[in-house]
C-alpha cells in the first residue's frame, strides 16, 4: 500500500484529516515520483540486456542447471528461466514506480516459492538471478537510484528465500 493510500486509510479510520506529518510524507513521496519513473524507465529500456547478463551469470555459476537433467537444460527451459528473470525485473519496476512492495506481493511472489519447489526448481538459482539483475541495474544507476531499486530486488529475494 502506497504512503498516500496508507495515510488516507489511517486518517479515515480515525475520522480525521491528514496530519501535517502525513502531508509531509505524501509531499516527499510525490516529489520523488519523477525519480522513481526515471529509474523504472532505465531498467525497462535495458531489460533485455539485464536479463541476458543475469542469465549468463547464473548459468556460469551454476552449470548444473544448464547441464542434461538441469532445470534450464535445452533451449526451451533456458528461455523459461530467462522469462522468469524478466518477470521479476518487471515486478521490481512496478514496485519502484509505486514506491511500495504491494504490487510485487500481490502480482508475483505470493506462492512463487511453493511453485518452484513443486517443480523442483532450485530457489537458489532464481535468487542468484535476481541478485545478478540487481547488480546489472546498479551499474546503470547513480548511487541513490541504485539503492532505491536495490531495495525492491532485495525484497523479491527475501520473499522467495
From Swiss-Prot:
GO cellular component: phycobilisome; plasma membrane-derived thylakoid membrane
GO BP term, example: photosynthesis
Its membrane topology: Peripheral membrane protein
InterPro entries: Globin-like_sf, Phycobilisome_asu/bsu, Phycobilisome_asu/bsu_sf
Entry comment on modification after translation: Contains one covalently linked bilin chromophore.
Compartment annotation: Cellular thylakoid membrane
Organism encoding this protein: Microchaete diplosiphon
Major subcellular location class: membrane
Residue list for modification N4-methylasparagine: 71
Key word Thylakoid present: yes
Pfam family, one: Phycobilisome
Family named by the database record: Belongs to the phycobiliprotein family.
Record function comment: Light-harvesting photosynthetic bile pigment-protein from the phycobiliprotein complex. Allophycocyanin has a maximum absorption at approximately 650 nanometers.
Annotated keywords: Antenna complex, Bile pigment, Chromophore, Electron transport, Membrane, Methylation, Photosynthesis, Phycobilisome, Thylakoid, Transport
Residues that, per the record, bind (2R,3E)-phycocyanobilin: 81
Name listed for the protein in its UniProt record: Allophycocyanin alpha chain 1
Keyword Electron transport: yes
Inducing factors: Constitutively transcribed in vegetative cells, not expressed during hormogonia differentiation in red light.
Subunit structure: Component of the phycobilisome. Heterodimer of an alpha and a beta chain.
Amino acid at each position: 500500500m502506497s504512503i498516500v493510500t496508507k495515510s488516507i486509510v489511517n486518517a479515515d479510520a480515525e475520522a480525521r484529516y491528514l496530519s501535517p506529518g502525513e502531508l509531509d510524507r505524501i509531499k516527499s513521496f510525490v516529489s520523488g515520483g519523477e525519480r522513481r519513473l526515471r529509474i523504472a524507465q532505465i531498467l525497462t529500456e535495458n531489460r533485455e540486456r539485464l536479463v541476458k547478463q543475469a542469465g549468463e551469470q547464473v548459468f556460469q555459476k551454476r552449470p548444473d542447471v544448464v547441464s542434461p537433467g538441469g532445470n534450464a537444460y535445452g533451449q526451451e527451459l533456458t528461455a523459461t528461466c530467462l522469462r522468469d528473470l524478466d518477470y521479476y525485473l518487471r515486478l521490481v519496476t512496478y514496485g519502484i514506480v509505486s514506491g511500495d512492495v504491494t504490487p510485487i506481493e500481490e502480482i508475483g511472489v505470493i506462492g512463487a516459492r511453493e511453485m518452484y519447489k513443486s517443480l523442483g526448481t532450485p530457489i537458489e538459482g532464481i535468487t542468484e538471478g535476481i541478485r545478478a539483475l540487481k547488480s546489472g541495474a546498479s551499474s546503470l544507476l547513480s548511487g541513490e537510484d541504485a539503492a532505491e531499486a536495490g531495495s525492491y530486488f532485495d525484497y523479491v529475494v527475501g520473499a522467495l528465500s
